[in-house]
Amino acid sequence: MAEEKSFPMTADGKAKLEQELEDLRLVRRPEVINRIKIARSYGDLSENSEYESAKDEQAFVEGRISQIETMLQYAVIIDNEDVAADEVSMGREITFQELPDEEPESYTIVGESESDPLSGKISNESPMAKGLLGHKVGDTVEIEIPNGSMKVKILSVK
C-alpha cells in the first residue's frame, strides 16, 4: 500500500482551507449546477459554449474540493511547543540577511498549501526554507538555491 503524503500546515492555514471548502460546497457548487441547468435549457449541447464553460468550472470546483478534502484528511498541524524559541521552524517568522550586506528580509515558513511569497509566506518545501529550518538565531547558513547558493545570517525568529 502506498504511503499517503502528509500536509504540514499552521492552524490558521487549516482554518482557511476549511473555509474555502465550505465556500466551494455551499456556494460555488450550487452556482455551477444552476449554470449547467440554465445552459441545458438552451437546447443542443454539442455547440453550447455556456454548457461547456459550466462543465469545465464544475470539473475545477469538484477537483478543488477533492484536493482540499485530501489535504485536510492528512493535515499535520505544526506545533512549536517543543522547539527552542530561537530555532527556525514552520509557523515562525524568520528575519535573515543575505551576506555580505543585503537588506534584511522576513518570511514566515508555512505548509505548501499556505505558501504565498508575495505576502511573506514561503513553503517549507522551498529551497530557502529547507536551508533555514533547524538553524538558530545568529547562525550563518549557506543555502542551495536554483541558480547557485547564497549565504545568509539569521537575525531573528518570532
Curated annotation (Swiss-Prot):
Pfam families: GreA_GreB (PF01272), GreA_GreB_N (PF03449). The keyword Coiled coil applies. One of its GO terms (biological process) is regulation of DNA-templated transcription elongation. It comes from the Bacteria. Keywords: Coiled coil, DNA-binding, Transcription, Transcription regulation. InterPro entries: GreA/GreB_C_sf, TF_GreA/GreB_CS, Tscrpt_elong_fac_GreA, Tscrpt_elong_fac_GreA/B, Tscrpt_elong_fac_GreA/B_C, Tscrpt_elong_fac_GreA/B_fam, Tscrpt_elong_fac_GreA/B_N, Tscrpt_elong_fac_GreA/B_N_sf. SUPFAM superfamilies: FKBP-like (SSF54534), GreA transcript cleavage protein, N-terminal domain (SSF46557). One of its GO terms (molecular function) is DNA binding. Residues 102-125 are annotated as: Disordered. The keyword Magnesium does not apply. Residues 49-69 form a coiled coil. Belongs to the GreA/GreB family. NCBIfam families: greA, PRK00226.1-1, PRK00226.1-2, PRK00226.1-4. Necessary for efficient RNA polymerase transcription elongation past template-encoded arresting sites. The arresting sites in DNA have the property of trapping a certain fraction of elongating RNA polymerases that pass through, resulting in locked ternary complexes. Cleavage of the nascent transcript by cleavage factors such as GreA or GreB allows the resumption of elongation from the new 3'terminus. GreA releases sequences of 2 to 3 nucleotides. This is Transcription elongation factor GreA. The gene is greA.
